[in-house]
């Protein structure tokens, strides 16, 4: 069945195909039944109870338009966004490119989204009752020295509607954003956001975990430094990781020269190495959500064995269809 759908989608430019997929999922979300049952393989992470450890990665549903549709595909949790305080168009099109030979995707979207207020309204309208993460970022026009303001605005607005909030400082498509991953800049950001989290937890009488999403393009020394900051600031989780700027695994393939972040199967080895190094430093103190290149039972299990507590995918679903979600949920063996 999906092979026919894929053939139709792959006849379109990548971003057009994504648009039609979101529209179809919006319609699917209105159906009184699910096309796929949600496999129960429960796990508790960050104080949250997940139906299974397989989640939708951020980037698939930036505005939270199709939450109920994605829920019918069997995910154990869903992460929407990245969302910014103000709506923005992102970078010029075309900005998404399939690397067919390697089952990868390069994007330079640049946080295109309709703004945090629109996302919140969409979340409020959704009937999904599973774990929902909301991924927050900064506007392209906001100077990097004022980035904290954007994260605080988004944190305040989404806090009541998310089960956990992800702070995205690792997209390669927003100028200078990755600079927030290092040293004093990271310490300042985390300290201020944890202070806000404490205030919001008291205000709403509910603690919502705060997660950091980091890049796979880090040296061992940088990973050690980030892990130290995560522990000192008592972050609740970390997503390892975002898209990569490396083209090592797709050299010579069509579109490999395009600028942007690479996701999908070619990212698997790099992201798994990131998880492994991070896990050694965190020593179980902070849970890891493994993201980047999950494309099979074996690749997912490798990430769990490296130290991940949960998994996220998106690109593999484009290439293989939603059956991979149930297969992973049934067969992944948690540590």
Curated annotation (Swiss-Prot):
Belongs to the dihydroorotate dehydrogenase family. Type 2 subfamily. The keyword Transport does not apply. This is Dihydroorotate dehydrogenase (quinone). It comes from the Bacteria. Binds 1 FMN per subunit. Keywords: Cell membrane, Flavoprotein, FMN, Membrane, Oxidoreductase, Pyrimidine biosynthesis. GO terms for cellular component: cytoplasm; plasma membrane. FMN binds at residues 58-62, 82, 135, 168, 213, 241, 264, 293, 314-315. The active site is at residue 171. Its main location: membrane. Its cofactor is FMN. It holds the Pfam family DHO_dh.
């Amino acid at each position: 069945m999906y092979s026919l759908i894929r053939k139709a989608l792959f006849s379109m430019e990548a971003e057009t195909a994504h648009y039609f997929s979101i529209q179809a999922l919006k319609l699917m979300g209105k159906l009184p039944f699910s096309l796929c049952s949600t496999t129960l393989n429960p796990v508790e992470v960050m104080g949250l109870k997940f139906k299974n450890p397989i989640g939708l990665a951020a980037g698939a549903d930036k505005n939270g338009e199709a939450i109920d549709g994605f829920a019918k595909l069997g995910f154990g949790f869903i992460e929407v966004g990245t969302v910014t305080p103000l709506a923005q168009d992102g970078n010029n099109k075309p900005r998404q490119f399939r690397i067919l030979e390697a089952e990868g995707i390069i994007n330079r979207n640049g946080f295109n989204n309709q703004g945090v207020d629109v996302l919140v309204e969409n979340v409020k309208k959704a009937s999904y009752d599973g774990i929902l993460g909301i991924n927050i970022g900064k506007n392209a026009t906001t100077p990097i020295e004022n980035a904290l303001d954007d994260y605080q605005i988004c944190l305040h607005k989404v806090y009541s509607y998310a089960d956990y909030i992800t702070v995205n400082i690792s997209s390669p498509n927003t100028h200078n954003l990755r600079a927030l991953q290092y040293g004093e800049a990271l310490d300042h950001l985390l300290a201020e956001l944890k202070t806000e989290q404490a205030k919001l937890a008291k205000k709403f009488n509910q603690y919502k975990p705060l997660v950091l999403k980091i890049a796979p393009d880090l040296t061992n020394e940088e990973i050690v430094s980030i892990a130290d900051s995560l522990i000192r600031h008592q972050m609740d989780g970390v997503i390892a990781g975002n898209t990569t700027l490396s083209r090592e695994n797709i050299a010579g393939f069509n579109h490999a020269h395009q600028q942007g972040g690479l996701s999908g199967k070619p990212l698997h080895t790099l992201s798994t190495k990131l998880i492994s190094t991070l896990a050694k430093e965190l020593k179980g103190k902070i849970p890891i959500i493994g993201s980047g290149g999950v494309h099979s039972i074996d690749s997912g299990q490798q990430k769990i064995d490296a130290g991940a507590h949960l998994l996220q995918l998106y690109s593999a679903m484009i290439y293989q269809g939603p059956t991979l979600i149930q297969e992973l949920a049934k067969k992944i063996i948690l540590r």
